[in-house]
Amino acid sequence: MTFGLVLLTFNEIEGIKELWDQIPFDEFDECFAVDGGSVDGTLEFFQQMNFSVNGQSKKGRGEAFRIAFNKSKSDFLIFYSPDGNEDPKDIKLIKNHFSNDDSLDIVICSRMMKSAHNEEDEQIFKFRKWANNIFNLFANLFFNKNFYKGYITDSINGFRGFKRSSFNILKLDAEGFTIEYQSTIRAFKNNMKIKEIPTIEGQRIGGESYAKSIPTGLRFINCLFKEILF
């Protein structure tokens, strides 16, 4: 049983510098980054740290996932974005769940379950969280065969790990931020075993999110209808 850690980056120099020493690289058989074309010093930082980087000729988070599995030889891959939203302490927890139960197909860090925290929780109007919960409800209603006993609370969050053999079965073709939503839906369709763990979502370190609310929401709607129809 081998494990790989993948850092997904696109202009994350502030985040990667602040979080680097908290990432448990020593826990993994291989570690590398997939970078979407950073121009802010992220690539130079990786070079300074002698850290392997795979570039993308085709942009998109979905493409980054596929590149990672093509480049990796590990049985399990964990994806981490060093932007401040994702808690590096949870990386080892994801790995431990796979180590303790190799029947798991996907492990997801949930921002919505009990003991978890979403970055909008202190706000009065939680538009992003509410939208996520709606998309999540639809995914469970339409596709989750174990809806009542195995309701998945955060089908969208990108902080997750996959078993290689399971990822290959999913045959994911989403290009951008819908890759995780599509992977959860297709895992439901294939009756895969998904484990969620509560996570504390932090505030972004530097810059702005590349997942703009309205365009991203429209892509999620498109993804949902495609999975319903096909």
Model segments located where?
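Conserved donor nucleotide-binding strand/loop of the catalytic core
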Residues: 29-32, 43-71
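Cell-envelope/extracellular polymer assembly enzymes that use nucleotide-activated donors
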Residues: 2-4, 182
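Catalytic donor-sugar/metal-binding loop of nucleotide-sugar-dependent glycosyltransferases
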Residues: 172-175, 184-202
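Acceptor/aglycone-binding surface of glycosyltransferases and processive sugar-polymer synthases
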Residues: 56-59, 63-71, 76, 89-177, ...
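A conserved acidic beta->alpha catalytic loop
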Residues: 35-43, 84
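Short beta-strand/loop segment that forms part of the nucleotide-sugar
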Residues: 20, 28-37
